[in-house]
Amino acid sequence: ITHATPASFIAHVPHRKAEEEIATYFLKTEIDFFLGGGKKFFDQREDDDRNLYQELKEKGYQVSDYFKMDFDDIVVNKNKNFAYFTANESPLPKSQGRDYLPYASRVATSFLKKRGQEKGFFLMIEGSQIDWGGHANESEYIISEMLDFDKAIGEVIDFAKRDGETLVVV
């Protein structure tokens, strides 16, 4: 969640590798829902002794992570902002068992629709490991990530069809 693409929507830092600094921006915003890797930049910090994971809870977020509970078992409270950490650092590739992206997309659209009935919402979903597979020149990695991302986008398109007022940009 602290990588360049998702972080660019909330954080403004001079370097993409400033992930501990990026993590602090999650406490400076009222982001409704976020899910992704990078837990260590919240609760195992090297630059200071802050526990941003705990600070999110104190700010009223419903916070959990893969160590405590599978994402499939989470009951999301629409009355609280939501944070779930899928990995301590970067999430596993799809080929190594990561299987939550389509389900998380469905949960996020439902949650955000309930939260933003009047004003609407913006949701950014990244298939970042497609790029990583490309850099590694690993075709199977790329294909498995693209298929997983396609399923996630399918969930969003299904939501948009039901909703009738949603624009999907891929």
Describe these PLM feature segments:
Residues 115-118, 162-164:
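Glycine-rich phosphate-binding loop signature in dinucleotide/nucleotide-binding domains
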Residues 4-9, 89-93, 116-120, 124-155:
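Active-site His/acidic residue clusters
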